[in-house]
C-alpha cells in the first residue's frame, strides 16, 4: 500500500501527538485485543494478561517503539521492520491475522485518546500505515 504525501504528514503529526504516551497506548491496545479477541492470548502463555500487568505494559512499549521507528522510516518500512518480521515469522510464528486485530485495537485506542485529532483523513492515513506495517511483518511468511 502506497502512502501519499498527505498520509505521511498525517502519520508523523499523529505520532508527534502520541509523544510520551506510546507505551501506555500500546499496552491499552494489547489489553483491548486480549479482551476483544481472547484467542490472541495464546501467543502470550507466559504473560499475566490482566489489566495493568507489567508484562503487558512492557510489550506495549515494544509495540509502540516499533511503530515509532516505522513512522520515522516511512520510505523504508521493509528495512526498518526486517528483524521484527523475521522474529514474528520464524521464531514466534504469529498468525498474520493478529496484526490486523492489533491494528484495529490501536486505532480505537488512539481515537479514544485524541478524538478531536482523529479526523477521517487521519484515520485513513493511520489505517493505511498500520496495514503497511502488517504487510511488511507478514512478508517473510511466504
Swiss-Prot record:
PANTHER family: HEMOGLOBIN FAMILY MEMBER, HEMOGLOBIN SUBUNIT ALPHA
Residues annotated with Phosphoserine modification: 4, 36, 50, 103, 112, 125, 132, 139
Biological process (GO), any one: carbon dioxide transport
Subunit structure of this chain's protein: Heterotetramer of two alpha chains and two beta chains.
Residues the entry annotates as binding O2: 59
Pfam families xrefs: Globin (PF00042)
Modified residues annotated as N6-acetyllysine in this record: 17
Gene Ontology terms, MF aspect: heme binding; iron ion binding; oxygen binding; oxygen carrier activity
Positions of modified residues (Phosphotyrosine): 25
Keyword Cell cycle: no
Entry binding sites for heme b: 88
Function recorded in the entry: Involved in oxygen transport from the lung to the various peripheral tissues.
Phosphothreonine PTM sites in chain numbering: 109, 135, 138
Chain positions with N6-succinyllysine modification: 8, 12, 17, 41
Organism annotation: Mus musculus
Protein name: Hemoglobin subunit alpha
Similarity field: Belongs to the globin family.
UniProt key word Cell cycle: no
GO CC annotations on file: hemoglobin complex; myelin sheath
Keywords: Acetylation, Heme, Iron, Metal-binding, Oxygen transport, Phosphoprotein, Transport
Amino acid at each position: 500500500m502506497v502512502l501519499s504525501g498527505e498520509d505521511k504528514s498525517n502519520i508523523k503529526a499523529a505520532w508527534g501527538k502520541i509523544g510520551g504516551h506510546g507505551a501506555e497506548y500500546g499496552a491499552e491496545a494489547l489489553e483491548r485485543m486480549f479482551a476483544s479477541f481472547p484467542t490472541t492470548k495464546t501467543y502470550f502463555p507466559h504473560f499475566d494478561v490482566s489489566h495493568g500487568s507489567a508484562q503487558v505494559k512492557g510489550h506495549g512499549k515494544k509495540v509502540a517503539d516499533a511503530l515509532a521507528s516505522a513512522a520515522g522510516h516511512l520510505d523504508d518500512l521493509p528495512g526498518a521492520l526486517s528483524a521484527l518480521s523475521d522474529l514474528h515469522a520464524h521464531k514466534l510464528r504469529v498468525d498474520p491475522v493478529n496484526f490486523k486485530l492489533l491494528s484495529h485495537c490501536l486505532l480505537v485506542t488512539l481515537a479514544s485518546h485524541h478524538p478531536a485529532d482523529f479526523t477521517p483523513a487521519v484515520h485513513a492515513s493511520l489505517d493505511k500505515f498500520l496495514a503497511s506495517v502488517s504487510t511488511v511483518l507478514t512478508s517473510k511468511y511466504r
